[in-house]
Amino acid sequence: MRSEQEMMDIFLDFALNDERIRLVTLEGSRTNRNIPPDNFQDYDISYFVTDVESFKENDQWLEIFGKRIMMQKPEDMELFPPELGNWFSYIILFEDGNKLDLTLIPIREAEDYFANNDGLVKVLLDKDSFINYKVTPNDRQYWIKRPTAREFDDCCNEFWMVSTYVVKGLARNEILFAIDHLNEIVRPNLLRMMAWHIASQKGYSFSMGKNYKFMKRYLSNKEWEELMSTYSVNGYQEMWKSLFTCYALFRKYSKAVSEGLAYKYPDYDEGITKYTEGIYCSVK
């Protein structure tokens, strides 16, 4: 596998020798000092160019970056409509395991880019001295934020209401429907509540990472095992068990948050739990 320095040299050398490229930035985890580096981090590179369309005429210019296993062009797909406006991106996995997420951005949109980026940006090349201020990468935008009373109640409401869809799916023997609601809505709100609880103890000055990937750092072995058990969805009994464990965990953490922030704890916890137990007893 080529080293980070080798890859960066390739990206910058290409940019230096192409007059269409005026500005180069690095984004994402490679700019975040709070994330330990590893070989699986993408190279999130943006080229700010004078003519995007000229690059799109063919893909031969991409060969300089290395031999690739696969390439995706998200803005050139029919099933998944593009979302980047005038931007155009390439996601490339190379044979040596390196991965590039390269975005072409019209140079005229650079000002908007810097005004609206997520903070994890490092300027690698600025041919025209466009940036006249210091750009320091930080992940502050992803720090856990103290919930308002309304946000706390919304999370509780969403968790308990959507859990009834899981119950309905299991009662109807529609396990894929149940699994989808557990995975996509119920558990994410459990994770949100757990993150709020942890931040209330540690301070609201850190990020849990994408998909709460750093949560294990803040849990005991027992707490982690309990959370992991909710991912067991291999059959109806396992699903019921996972759902009831989600209930117990959500109750534990949401009560802790409500007490710590002096927020009202919702009264529908008890009612939904009894409803679920009744349905479970009728179908098991």
From Swiss-Prot:
pH dependence: Optimum pH is 8.0.
Transmembrane segments annotated in the record for this chain: none
Primary role: Mediates bacterial resistance to streptomycin. Adenylates streptomycin on the O-6 residue. Adenylates streptidine on the O-6 residue. Does not act on spectinomycin, neomycin-B or kanamycin. Specific for ATP and GTP nucleotides incorporating a purine ring. No reaction with CTP or UTP.
Reaction equations catalysed: streptomycin + ATP = 6-O-adenylylstreptomycin + diphosphate; streptomycin + GTP = 6-O-guanylylstreptomycin + diphosphate; streptidine + ATP = 6-O-adenylylstreptidine + diphosphate
One Pfam short name: Adenyl_transf
Major subcellular location class: cytoplasm
Biotechnological relevance of this protein: Could be used as a selectable marker in B.subtilis if strongly expressed, could be used as a selectable marker in E.coli. Streptidine restores the antibiotic effectiveness of streptomycin in bacterial strains in which they both are co-administered together with a simultaneous overexpression of this enzyme.
Disrupted-gene phenotype: Very slight reduction in streptomycin MIC.
Subunit structure: Homodimer.
Compartments it resides in: Cytoplasm
EC number: 2.7.7.-
GO BP annotations listed: cellular response to streptomycin
GO terms under cellular component: cytoplasm
Superkingdom of origin: Bacteria
GO MF annotations, alphabetized: adenylyltransferase activity; protein homodimerization activity
Comment on activity versus temperature: Optimum temperature is 35 degrees Celsius.
Keywords for the protein's UniProt record, in alphabetical order: Cytoplasm, Nucleotidyltransferase, Transferase
Protein's name in the database: Aminoglycoside 6-adenylyltransferase
Other facts noted in the record for this chain: Although this enzyme can be purified from B.subtilis, the bacteria is sensitive to streptomycin in vivo.
